[in-house]
Swiss-Prot record:
Residues 241-261 dip into the membrane without crossing it. Belongs to the potassium channel KCNN family. KCa3.1/KCNN4 subfamily. The modification Phosphohistidine is found at residue 358. This is Intermediate conductance calcium-activated potassium channel protein 4. It holds the Pfam family CaMBD. The chain crosses the membrane at residues 29-49, 59-79, 108-128, 143-163, 207-227, 265-285. It is linked to Dehydrated hereditary stomatocytosis 2: An autosomal dominant hemolytic anemia characterized by primary erythrocyte dehydration. Erythrocytes exhibit decreased total cation and potassium content that are not accompanied by a proportional net gain of sodium and water. Affected individuals typically manifest mild to moderate compensated hemolytic anemia, with an increased erythrocyte mean corpuscular hemoglobin concentration and a decreased osmotic fragility, both of which reflect cellular dehydration. It is found in: Cell membrane; Cell projection, Ruffle membrane. One of its GO terms (molecular function) is intermediate conductance calcium-activated potassium channel activity. The gene is KCNN4. Phosphorylation at His-358 by NDKB activates the intermediate conductance calcium-activated potassium channel activity, and conversely it's dephosphorylation by PHPT1 inhibits this activity. Homodimer. Homotetramer. Heterotetramer of potassium channel proteins. Interacts with MTMR6; this interaction leads to selective dephosphorylation of PI(3)P in a lipid microdomain adjacent to KCNN4, resulting in a decrease of intermediate conductance calcium-activated potassium channel activity. Interacts (via the C-tail domain) with CALM1; the calmodulin binding is constitutive, does not require calcium and mediates calcium-dependent gating and four calmodulin molecules bind to one channel tetramer. Gene3D superfamilies: 1.10.287.70.
Length: 427
C-alpha cells in the first residue's frame, strides 16, 4: 500500500478515486451481507418446514452462506485497505504502517469476527444414517436449529451495521467538494450521524417508515425463531407479526406472550426501540405542524392588528364606564354608581390583559431574529458608510486642491511686491 508521495491536483484526484472505490466496495459488501442473511433465513425456514428429503438442499444453502461470507471478508479487508490509502493521501504519508493504528487494527479484527459468524457446513444432516441406502419414506426433521446454530444464525443479523457505511458513501457528502469545504470551515465531521440527521430533515416520513417496518419484520422473525419449539403457539410467524407491533407501540393486549427467555428479551428490546421511534415521530410531527417564516409573519401581523383593535375597544369602554360612574355619582344614584364602578374595574382589568398580550407578542416578534433582514440592513449600512467615506475623500481632495490654488495665488500676488525690497536696501 506504500508508494510515492502525491501532492497538489494529483492528490485530489487520487482521493476522489479512492472514495469511489470505497463506495463500490461498501455497496458490494452490503449486497453480500444481505444475500447471506437471506440465505440464512431460507435455511432456517427450510429446516423447519422440510424433512429429510431436503437435506441435500440445506447443505448446499449452508455452503453458499460460507462462500458469501468468505467473499464478504475479502471485501471488508479491501475496504479498510482503501481507507488506509486514503489516510496516507490526506496526510502525505508513504509507509502504510504509520497510517494503520492499533485502534483501527482492532476494528478490522472485530468486523472480520462479526461478519465471519455463520452456521458453517461442518457436519451432515442428522437424519441421514446411511448415505448408500435410499430413503423409502421421508421422515420428519428431528428438531429445529440447535442452540449454537441458532445463535450463529441470529448473529448474522449483526452484518446490518454495513448499512450506515454504505448510506454514508452513497449519499455523496464525502464526494462533494462544497460539503467538504464548508464543513472544514465550520469544523463539521461528515459521519453517520450527520447523514442520519440529513435524511431526517429531508425525508423524515420515508426514513421513519422504513426503519419501523424493518424493525418489525426483523424482530418478528427473530421472535419466531426463539419461540419456534416452545409449548405455546407464539412461535408462528403470524402471532409474532401481531405481537411485535403491539409491543412496539407499547400497547400490550396480553393475548399473545413470549414463553422463552430469548423471546422476552426480544420483546423488551422491541419496546425500547418503539419508545425511541415514537419520540422521533412526535418530534417530526411537531416540527411539521410549526409555522414557517412567512406563515409566522402573517400570523403575528394579524394578531397585532387584532390586539390593537381590542386595546382601542377596551380603552373606549374604560372611558365610557368612567363617565357613567362619574355621572351617577354626581346624581347621587348609589346603585347605578356601584354597578358602573364594577364595570369600570372589569374594563380596566380587560384593558390590562389585552395590553399584556400585545406586549408579549411584540417581544416575541422582536426576539425572532431574521438573518436575511439583518444581513440586508448591515449591507445597506456598509454601503452608506462606503459612499459617505468616498464623498468625504472627494471633499478633502477638492479642499486640498483649492488650498493649493490659493497658495499659488498668494505667492503670485505677494511675489512682485517683495522683490524690490533688496534693491531699495542697496540704495
Amino acid at each position: 500500500m506504500g508508494g510515492d508521495l502525491v501532492l497538489g491536483l494529483g492528490a485530489l484526484r487520487r482521493r476522489k478515486r479512492l472514495l469511489e472505490q470505497e463506495k463500490s466496495l461498501a455497496g458490494w459488501a452490503l449486497v453480500l451481507a444481505g444475500t447471506g442473511i437471506g440465505l440464512m433465513v431460507l435455511h432456517a425456514e427450510m429446516l423447519w418446514f422440510g424433512g429429510c428429503s431436503w437435506a441435500l438442499y440445506l447443505f448446499l444453502v449452508k455452503c453458499t452462506i460460507s462462500i458469501s461470507t468468505f467473499l464478504l471478508l475479502c471485501l471488508i479487508v479491501a475496504f479498510h485497505a482503501k481507507e488506509v490509502q486514503l489516510f496516507m493521501t490526506d496526510n502525505g504519508l508513504r509507509d502504510w504502517r504509520v497510517a494503520l493504528t492499533g485502534r483501527q487494527a482492532a476494528q478490522i479484527v472485530l468486523e472480520l469476527v462479526v461478519c465471519g459468524l455463520h452456521p458453517a457446513p461442518v457436519r451432515g444432516p442428522p437424519c441421514v444414517q446411511d448415505l448408500g441406502a435410499p430413503l423409502t419414506s421421508p421422515q420428519p426433521w428431528p428438531g429445529f436449529l440447535g442452540q449454537g446454530e441458532a445463535l450463529l444464525s441470529l448473529a448474522m443479523l449483526l452484518r446490518l451495521y454495513l448499512v450506515p457505511r454504505a448510506v454514508l458513501l452513497r449519499s455523496g457528502v464525502l464526494l462533494n467538494a462544497s460539503y467538504r469545504s464548508i464543513g472544514a470551515l465550520n469544523q463539521v465531521r461528515f459521519r453517520h450521524w450527520f447523514v442520519a440527521k440529513l435524511y431526517m430533515n429531508t425525508h423524515p416520513g420515508r426514513l421513519l417508515l422504513g426503519l419501523t417496518l424493518g424493525l418489525w419484520l426483523t424482530t418478528a422473525w427473530v421472535l419466531s425463531v426463539a419461540e419456534r419449539q416452545a409449548v405455546n403457539a407464539t412461535g408462528h410467524l403470524s402471532d409474532t407479526l401481531w405481537l411485535i407491533p403491539i409491543t412496539f407501540l407499547t400497547i400490550g393486549y396480553g393475548d399473545v406472550v413470549p414463553g422463552t427467555m430469548w423471546g422476552k428479551i426480544v420483546c423488551l428490546c422491541t419496546g425500547v426501540m418503539g419508545v425511541c421511534c415514537t419520540a422521533l415521530l412526535v418530534a417530526v410531527v411537531a416540527r411539521k405542524l410549526e409555522f414557517n417564516k412567512a406563515e409566522k409573519h402573517v400570523h403575528n401581523f394579524m394578531m397585532d392588528i387584532q390586539y390593537t383593535k381590542e386595546m382601542k375597544e377596551s380603552a373606549a369602554r374604560v372611558l365610557q364606564e368612567a363617565w357613567m360612574f362619574y355621572k351617577h355619582t354626581r346624581r347621587k344614584e348609589s346603585h347605578a354608581a356601584r354597578r358602573h364602578q364594577r364595570k369600570l374595574l372589569a374594563a380596566i382589568n380587560a384593558f390590562r390583559q389585552v395590553r399584556l398580550k400585545h406586549r408579549k407578542l411584540r417581544e416575541q416578534v422582536n426576539s425572532m431574529v431574521d438573518i436575511s433582514k439583518m444581513h440586508m440592513i448591515l449591507y445597506d449600512l456598509q454601503q452608506n458608510l462606503s459612499s459617505s467615506h468616498r464623498a468625504l475623500e472627494k471633499q478633502i481632495d477638492t479642499l486640498a486642491g483649492k488650498l493649493d490654488a490659493l497658495t499659488e495665488l498668494l505667492s503670485t500676488a505677494l511675489g512682485p511686491r517683495q522683490l524690490p525690497e533688496p534693491s531699495q536696501q542697496s540704495k
